[in-house]
């Protein structure tokens, strides 16, 4: 709550809903996205783009989901207790400050532990490959701005390999 008070401009409110309080039509047509930082926490800190990179990532993912006629209205954390606990909150706050729509936050732990790779998540264990994947980074590569990437892969292992290589390219 204190973080929200310091980061939010103007007033804010928190509404809590149980899934059975949300109309079935909305549940069937609304999606949530896991937002997380991928790469070295030390490099992310050095780059100083922790929050804005998350917004670029979310923007890429929204575009990827539109290709599948799906809209994202909620964010959730890929892991609780580590750095990625804060990512959905920061993305929601920064996106709103940049004039974006309000993004809801889902309060649950998607994995119950730290997730070192995309292919070690509970989604992957249940057979749901991270597809599509939206990546965002603010640094430039060879003078060209490379802020958004959309990746469509068949398997979680492919997604992980491509995402890790892009982290190397973006020096994150």
Where are each of the predicted segments found?
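N-terminal low-complexity or amphipathic/hydrophobic leaders
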Residues: 1-33
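Buried hydrophobic packing segments
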Residues: 3-4, 61-64, 88-95, 163
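Flexible, glycine/charged-enriched surface loops at secondary-structure junctions
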Residues: 13, 169-172
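Glycine-rich oxoanion-binding loops at beta->alpha junctions
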Residues: 22-71
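A short, small-residue-rich loop immediately preceding and capping a beta-strand
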Residues: 71-83, 101-106
């Amino acid at each position: 709550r204190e973080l929200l008070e310091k980061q939010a401009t103007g007033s804010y409110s928190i509404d809590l809903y149980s899934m059975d309080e949300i109309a079935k039509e909305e549940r069937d047509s609304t999606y949530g996205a896991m937002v997380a930082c991928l790469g070295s926490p030390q490099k992310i800190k050095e780059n100083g783009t922790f929050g804005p990179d998350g917004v670029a990532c979310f923007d890429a993912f929204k575009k990827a989901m539109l290709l599948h006629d799906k809209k994202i209205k909620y964010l959730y954390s890929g892991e609780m207790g580590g750095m990625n606990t804060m990512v959905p909150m920061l993305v929601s706050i920064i996106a709103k400050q940049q004039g974006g729509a309000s993004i809801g936050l889902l309060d649950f732990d998607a994995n119950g532990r730290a997730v070192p790779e995309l292919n070690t998540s509970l989604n992957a264990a249940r057979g749901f490959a991270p597809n599509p994947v939206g990546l965002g980074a603010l640094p430039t590569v060879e003078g060209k701005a490379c802020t958004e990437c959309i990746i469509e892969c068949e398997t979680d292992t492919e997604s992980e390999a491509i995402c890790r290589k892009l982290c190397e390219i973006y020096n994150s």
